């Protein structure tokens, strides 16, 4: 068990409800989750079970109906959208289950693209991407 000083991400009581007309659907109910530095976690469930919704809440891409998400001790819902984006870009990354390479880009540019999105200069991103490709033998 890791110490609380290594706590990276913490969620308490996360609940998400969607309202559409007369439909009131609770997708997540009172989810608690702690992720410490070095932890590896998997979120597994059937299609439509709320996995993507949970990840969106944890990353501040959507707001919970109830509950809190702390990233390095900061309540992300209390931050401005710009501050949320900065925190997300610094500490989080998203890989969706239907990811794909962009055929119009080289392998190097496909690897560098997330760094460009995080506003890393093109040359620095390509150097980092080349180093990553070399580490995995590509």
Q: Where does each model-flagged region fall?
A:
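Helix-to-loop junction immediately C-terminal to a conserved catalytic motif
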Residues: 59
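Short coil-to-helix segment of the ABC ATPase nucleotide-binding domain corresponding to the Q-loop/switch region
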Residues: 105-114
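ATP-binding/catalytic-site motifs of ATP-hydrolyzing domains
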Residues: 68-70, 74
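A short, flexible loop at the N-terminus of ABC-type nucleotide-binding domains that lies
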Residues: 4-8, 17-30
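Short beta-strand immediately N-terminal to the Walker A/P-loop
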Residues: 41-42, 94
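ABC ATPase NBD coupling module
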Residues: 22-25, 76-92
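Conserved ABC ATPase "signature" region
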Residues: 74-75, 123-138
């Amino acid at each position: 068990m890791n110490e609380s000083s290594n706590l990276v991400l913490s969620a308490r009581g996360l609940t998400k409800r969607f309202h559409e007309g007369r439909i009131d659907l609770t997708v997540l109910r009172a989810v608690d989750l702690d992720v410490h530095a070095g932890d590896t976690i998997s979120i597994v469930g059937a299609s439509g079970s709320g996995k993507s919704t949970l990840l969106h809440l944890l990353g501040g891409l959507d707001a919970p109906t109830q509950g809190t998400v702390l990233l390095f001790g900061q309540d992300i819902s209390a931050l401005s959208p710009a501050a949320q984006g900065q925190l997300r870009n610094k500490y989080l990354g998203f890989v969706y289950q239907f990811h794909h390479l962009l055929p119009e880009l080289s392998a190097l540019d496909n690897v560098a693209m997330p760094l460009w999105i995080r506003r890393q200069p093109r040359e620095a991103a390509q150097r980092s991407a080349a180093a990553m490709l070399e580490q995995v033998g590509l």
